[in-house]
Amino acid sequence: MTRHFLVDTDLNPQEQTEVLDLALQLKRNPYLRQPFAGVGAGRKTVAVIFDKTSTRTRVSFAAGISELGGTPLIIGAGESQLGHKESIADTAKVLERMVATIVWRTFAQVGLEEMAANSKVPVINALSDDYHPCQLLADLLTIKEHKGGLKGLTMTYLGDGANNMANSYLLAGVTAGMHVRIAAPAEYQPDESVVRDALNRADETGGSVLVTTDPRLAASGADVLATDTWVSMGQEDEKASRAEIFKPYALDAAALALAAADAVVLHCLPAYRGYEIAAEVIDGPQSVVWDEAENRLHAQKALMAWLVERS
């Protein structure tokens, strides 16, 4: 059966551990696994489709596919018939006959679901409006490197709780058995359905979920502090108003002082210093942001290898 990765919970706890452990191995030995190379490996091309602009996602997938022995085929916005002159379902049926895997950075989660439903090759969510599961694999890999493990750690996210990063922190974090806290204004908290899914997964793993409007409560004693931009793509006209709303949720020195003394700081980038995160924090000694950015490469390589070898 073809395996896809559309949302963080598409990997169960054991599978998530397998992918992260493989990522650590690939970080030490980049060419350890090459599922797209060699005799009998099948197709070598991976379609990487971008409906949204990207730096880290584009570079990490392109480099990772090459290191896995494959060839990345980058398809930018407006460079195909996808979604306007040809249906998603028909596009999937064509691509599956030509490529080994489909990676898609897009807007609507439902589009990814339709692509996967009509594809016999793995489909990977490289970001949607609802989830950013590849980023969370990189984040968990980074935490595991610096903390030695994941289970039982407290991970706090401050800021816009209604965005894709908050959703993925909830789902990926509890899958790893972590205690996940989201601090956000009342009108910007995660959707109830996502919280419900996270609670269900937490019941399996011993993790927990706290959603609050109190950033001090959320930051207190945390092992990991994370944030994301307050102004996502398409929200540029709201920059001033959103900056005022989210100001109490900034990841600054005061927030960091409330966390555990050895807490690490995450930000998926791009970062806006002086807004969601202080320069002294992102550029300070507790920041692991640059390891986090690099780990997109290793985590996604592990994910692609894991999916292809099981599909």
Curated annotation (Swiss-Prot):
Pathway recorded for this protein: Amino-acid biosynthesis; L-arginine biosynthesis; L-arginine from L-ornithine and carbamoyl phosphate: step 1/3
Domain of life from the UniProt record: Bacteria
GO biological process, one term: citrulline biosynthetic process
GO MF annotation terms: amino acid binding; ornithine carbamoyltransferase activity
EC number: 2.1.3.3
InterPro entries registered for this protein in UniProt: Asp/Orn_carbamoyltranf_P-bd, Asp/Orn_carbamoylTrfase, Asp/Orn_carbamoylTrfase_sf, Asp_carbamoyltransf_Asp/Orn-bd, Orn/put_carbamltrans, OTCase_ArgI
Spans through the membrane: none
Protein's job: Reversibly catalyzes the transfer of the carbamoyl group from carbamoyl phosphate (CP) to the N(epsilon) atom of ornithine (ORN) to produce L-citrulline.
Protein name as it appears in the record: Ornithine carbamoyltransferase
Provenance organism: Renibacterium salmoninarum (strain ATCC 33209 / DSM 20767 / JCM 11484 / NBRC 15589 / NCIMB 2235)
Gene giving rise to this polypeptide: argF
